[in-house]
Every structure is written in structure tokens, then in C-alpha cells.
Amino acid sequence: RNLLVVDETSMVDVMLMQSLMKALPDRAALLIVGDIDQLPSVGPGQVLGDVISSGAVPVLRLTDVFRQAAQSRIIMSAHRINQGSIPDLGPPEAESDFYFVQADDPETAVARIIELVKTRIPKRFGLDPIRDIQVLCPMNRGDAGADQLNRDLQDLLNPAQLEVERGGRVFRAGDKVMQIENDYDKEVYNGDIGYVDDVDPDAGELKANFDGRAVTYGFGELDTLVPAYAATIHKSQGSEYPAVVIPVLTQH
């Protein structure tokens, strides 16, 4: 008997789940795994939550967290938010994995984010500002949205390289980039993170590295790539990073 395991099921919408169920053989078992406290799917429906609340299938809830220590401020803050409470935003008394940085307006927030990514986090924790630190935004638009922060961080962290501009986006050698569509021919998929190795204007090609594998894009194919110094929280679901900076503004 076959078993199909679907992870990150909170991202699955109604149409995709219907297609999956139609394709599943009658004698196959289906195990769905996910977190109902994550953002819902971009498409319609709340499949995972509805399946759990239906009472029609056995449900096992995992409550122990192994990714962080039990006393992690990330974990304690997440639990308080889930319970509808404000997390502890005060400065930590000792070494911590969660910090709150105050900013009174979007312009100040952007300046603080840039300082954190470029200087403070690399100096304090020894992390690479491009490969190890990810800015995650609630939205693309706005002064502290992913689009503008990508432009700001790209200019500061990776200026004056060979570049190509397509669709209002600039791609430079050394950039962090994200694939935003599934490409089965290139074997790169929506949400994959890579790094630009080379931009060749003569050949009209960009070469990027995804987990040690070289992928070539013609300049006409760059609409499937975006700079990824900053990304939306939706696009980052299922990923993990050594350090994350999240702007939380009233405009969000």
C-alpha cells in the first residue's frame, strides 16, 4: 500500500487539494502535515484548518518544539501572539534569539533595518549579510515593503557589479535571488533561493547557483526571478534562515 505525505499543507488551496485527491489512488494513504497558525494559502480556502475541525479524520497535534530551545524568546513570543497577547518587547537580560528594535516612522524603520543587516547583526553574530540574513516583509509595497528594501539593500550590499535590468528589476553578479515560478525544465521551483554567479551581456545570459547547481537564464527569462535580500512572509513559508529581520509597521 502506498503512502503520500504532504508537508506545509497550510499553503494548499481548495483547487490544488481537489486535484491531489482526484489523482490519489483508491488504496493509497494520505498524511498531511502543516501548521494552522501559519498564513493561509494564497488561493481560496483554509484546507488544513477545515480538515482538522471536520472531525472526519484522525488528527495528531505536535506540541514540543525542537528547532529552538524551550526557553527561546522566539518560541515564547510566538505562543503569546497565538494566545492574543503582546510578547515581551523589552531588552533581554542575557543572550537571546529575539530582539525588538523601536522605530517611530517608516523612514526610521528602513534606516534601522539597513543598519541591522549591513552592520549590527554581522558584527554581533558573525553572519554574512547576504547569505545568512533574510528580511521578511508583510507586503511588497511601501517604504518598508520587500520591493523598496530590495533596492536599498542591493545598492548597499552589492553595488557596482555587472548588471542587467529587466521588468524594472536590476540583477547583478553576487545578488541573492528567488525563483517565483516553478520551472520543471531548469528544475528550480517557486521560493528557491540562489545567488547570481555571472551576468553576460554579450551572450544575453545570467548564471545563478541554486544549492551548488548552476542554472542559466536568458535575459528574456528573468521575469521568473526577483532579488531576494527582502521577501514577503508568504514567499518564505517552509524556509529557514540563520537570522531574520521583520518590519512590523502600523501601515501593514
Regions found by a protein language model. Name each.
Residues V33-V177, E181-K186:
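Conserved helicase motor core of P-loop NTPases
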